[in-house]
Design a protein with these regions (language model features):
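Residues that form generic nucleotide/phosphate-binding pockets
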Residues: 66, 125, 129, 167, ...
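Flexible, charged interface-and-hinge segments in very large macromolecular machines
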Residues: 78-83, 120-148
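Extended, Lys/Glu-rich alpha-helical coiled-coil stalks
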Residues: 29-31, 140-180
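Short coil/turn segments at secondary-structure boundaries
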Residues: 114-117, 151
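Alpha-helical scaffold elements adjacent to nucleotide-binding pockets in ATP/GTP-utilizing enzyme cores
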Residues: 41-44, 102, 121, 125, ...
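Extreme N-terminal "head/tail" segments of very large remodeling/mechanoenzyme assemblies
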Residues: 1-115, 128
Length: 180
């Protein structure tokens, strides 16, 4: 189970500063008027996990668009736990220069690992820790961007099937049945 623990956001989209501690149990509701930052808050979590804007695959958004207007940099730090592992993901965007990332993985009862700072290595490790749920799978299933509720429905059959298999963990099940 993935449990969000803490989120810090600075100069991301329309969010100036957020320091949010999530409850250990229960449901979380983001409520507010239009343009209050609810979607930006969710996109900051998505960005922390995958390092891309939600709309990046559609050519609608670049990474610089995530930096608050008038600011030169944005940062997002997300702490989450997955089983006995805790991940601390920090991503910083420098307008016009791309992003830097640091991933710290802490395993219960194990010595602390060295932080991972290479973008590709970090992204792959996060996807692995998330049970192979990549950005496309999350975006097509349960993390729907505004005005894209029909996204899963409009995918070609084979892509829809692949997305659902990843989401439900059926690929792992198929591999296990082949092994035994």
């Amino acid at each position: 189970m993935i449990i969000l623990k803490h989120l810090t956001v600075e100069h991301f989209r329309l969010l100036r500063e957020i320091d949010l501690h999530f409850p250990q149990r229960g449901s979380i509701l983001f409520q507010g008027p239009n343009e209050a930052g609810k979607s930006a808050l969710l996109e900051s979590i998505y960005f922390a996990l995958y390092g891309t804007p939600i709309a990046s695959d559609h050519g609608k958004s670049s990474i610089d668009d995530l930096v608050l207007y008038g600011s030169s940099r944005a940062s997002v730090t997300l702490t989450l736990s997955i089983g006995a592992n805790e991940l601390i993901i920090n991503r910083v965007i420098e307008r016009g220069k791309g992003q830097q990332v640091t991933l710290q993985v802490r395993k219960l009862g194990m010595p602390e690992e060295e932080p991972i700072t290479r973008l590709g290595t970090t992204n792959e490790r996060i996807i692995t820790e998330l049970g192979r749920v990549d950005a496309e799978t999350l975006r097509n299933s349960c993390f729907i961007e505004q005005k894209s509720l029909n996204r899963l429905e409009n995918l070609p059959g084979s892509e829809r099937e692949t997305t659902l298999r990843k989401l439900l963990g059926l690929e792992k099940l198929l591999r296990l049945t082949e092994q035994f």
